[in-house]
Amino acid sequence: NMKKALGGGYVAYLVVAVLLAVITGIWSEMGVVQLVIWVIFSAFAAIASELIVGISAMYSGWFPGFATALIFLIVGMLIGFPSLPLGILVAYTSATGPAFSDMAYDLKCGYILRGCGQDQELELEGRKQQYISEIIGFIVAFILVAIMAKQYFSQGLFAPVDATFAATI
């Protein structure tokens, strides 16, 4: 059920946005009204980025992820978010769309490899296995980033997009 899946995704993004808002809001001493606006905006930005990038990246590559993150950066600046919450917002929104696109590619490929849904039982089992594989991939990626991030960034290895975001701010 698409409506249930998107609704569940939005709730999950909202929960993460609330957690990020509380942490960054307390850290940067945001006012209550600004904090509430940030929570709502970041949840909207995440779901919008997920849909825009997820759908368009299947046809036009990774550029939409950069473009939507830049748009949310500019809108966040116009709203007046402090730099720390704004940086978190941009990172948050830029992560949601490409993740959705990757999952769409994975599911589409699996669907084709399993015979385009001709065997319903095989299709459901295949989706379950893909889901488990993606969770394992997420856990491995999380651990590697936690271990290697400090070493990576201490060498000045930043994605080229950081210069655009920094120049915009």
Predicted regions and their residues:
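Alpha-helical multipass membrane-protein architecture
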Residues: 1-169
